[in-house]
Amino acid sequence: MIPVIALVGRPNVGKSTLFNQLTRSRDALVADYPGLTRDRKYGDGKLGEHEFIVIDTGGISGDEQGIDEKMARQSLLAIEEADVVLFLVDGRHGLNPADEMIASHLRRSNKQVSLVVNKTDGINEDIALADFYSLGFGELHPIAASHGKGVHVLIDKVMLPFAERVEEAKNQISIESRGIRIGVVGRPNVGKSTLVNRMLGEDRVVVYDMPGTTRDSVYIPYVRNDKEYTLIDTAGIRRRKHVKEAVEKFSIVKALQAIQDANVVIVVIDSHENLVEQDLHMIGYVLDAGRGVIIAINKWDGLKKDDREHIKSEVERRLGFVPYAKVHYISALHGTGVGDLYDTIESTYESCYAKWTTNRLTRILEDSIAEHQPPMVNSRRIKLRYAHQGGSNPPRIVVHGNQTDSLPGSYKRYLENKFRTVLNITGTPIIFEFKSAENPFAPKK
C-alpha cells in the first residue's frame, strides 16, 4: 500500500503550504476541471522517487469547542490512519503550549513522528531549533515550506523505511490480483458492499477492520464469462454485536489507496440523497490519480418517474466536469443494471491502456487543424506540427509546435474532444502536453 503522511500541528504553522508543496507535482499533471471543487485536505504526493498520500489534518490548539472540536477529532483520527506523522511547529514563534499538548498525544500514538520546524528561512537555524528539543522527538527537521527549502531532504528521510515496503506491496498486488483491478468507492452506506457482493455473485461480508492488519483493502480475484478481474473491496464492514445490519466504517484513506491500486474505479452514489460535495470530491480524487472512472447511481429501483428525471438532470448538471464518464443507474440489491457495468469496465480499461502510433496521432492533429485552425498570436498563427503518445493510464498525448504556450484553453479543449471522439476514448482523462520547438535564430537571452 502507498504510505500515508499526516501533517499535524497547531493553526498557522504552515501545514497547508507544505501540503501544496508535496502535492503540486501531481496537481500539475491534471487540468482544473470547471465545476470541480477539490477537497484540499487529502492529496496524492510525489517527490523524487517517493509516492505517498498526504493528509492535512487542520489545526489543533487544545481548546476547541463545537464544530472545531469535531474537526480536531477528525485530525486525531487521521493520525491513526497515517504511516508517518509530520509534526509541524513554527520556528519564528518558538515553543507554544499547544505544541506541547499535541506532542503529548503523539507520544502516546506509537506512530513514526518527525518533528518539522518550519519558517526557518532568514533566521538563525540553531536558535530556532533550540526550543523544540525539549519535546523529545530526537532529530529536528528545519524547513521553509513556502520556498521548498529542506522539503526534499525531509521526505527522503521519512520515506526511506517504506521504499522496500512499497516495492513489496506492488509485487504482492500483482501476485494477488488478476485481470482488470476494479476499485469500488463512495460515501458510507451508498451500497458499496452490496455492489461488491453482487459483482462477485455471492453474499459475503469480509471482516478486515481488525486491529493490527497491515492492509485495509481486500483483493478478491474472480472470473466472469471466462475473463479475470480483481475487486478491491474497501467498505470496511463490521458487524455490530446483537444487531443484524452491517455498519460501514468510512475511511477516506482506504478509498484513496484503492484508487491508486485500481485500473478502473466505480464511484457509487446514492440516488436517494442526490449528489453531494463528497461525491464530487471522490470523483476528483479518481481524476487526480488519472484512473478510469465509472459512475454508478445506486438504489434506482423503486424511485418514482419524477424523482428519476430530477436525478438525471442533476447528474447532467453537476457532472459536467467529467462528460466522458459513463453513468449507470443500478440497483445493487436486486442486480438491476449491474451486469451492464462490465462492458464499460472493459472499454474504460482499453482506453486507459491504449497504444497509438505517432503517424495516427499526427494525422488526427492535421485533420483537426484543417477543420479549425489555431488562433493568431501577434499576427502569427500558432503552428502545431506533430503529436505522439507520451504514456498511458491515463493516456498522455504530446503535441509539438511553435508558440504552444499561447494556445488558449478553448482550443486545447477542442483538440481533446476531437482526439477523444476519433480514438473512441471513454472513462479516462486525457493529458495533453504542448511543447514548443526552439527557434535557432531567436536572440539568446
From Swiss-Prot:
Domain of life of the source: Bacteria
Entry-linked InterPro entries: AAA+_ATPase, G_ENGA, GTP-bd, GTPase_Der, KH_dom-like, KH_dom-like_a/b, P-loop_NTPase, Small_GTP-bd
Membrane-spanning parts: none
Function text: GTPase that plays an essential role in the late steps of ribosome biogenesis.
Domain KH-like, chain residue ranges per copy: 354-438
Source species: Marinomonas sp. (strain MWYL1)
Subunit structure: Associates with the 50S ribosomal subunit.
A single GO molecular function term of this UniProt record: GTP binding
SUPFAM superfamilies, A to Z: P-loop containing nucleoside triphosphate hydrolases
GO process annotations (BP): ribosome biogenesis
Keyword field contains Protease: no
Entry binding sites for GTP 1: 9-16, 56-60, 118-121
Protein name as it appears in the record: GTPase Der
Keyword Nucleotide-binding: yes
Chain sites annotated for binding GTP 2: 186-193, 233-237, 298-301
Similarity field: Belongs to the TRAFAC class TrmE-Era-EngA-EngB-Septin-like GTPase superfamily. EngA (Der) GTPase family.
Domain EngA-type G: 3-166, 180-353
Keywords assigned: GTP-binding, Nucleotide-binding, Repeat, Ribosome biogenesis
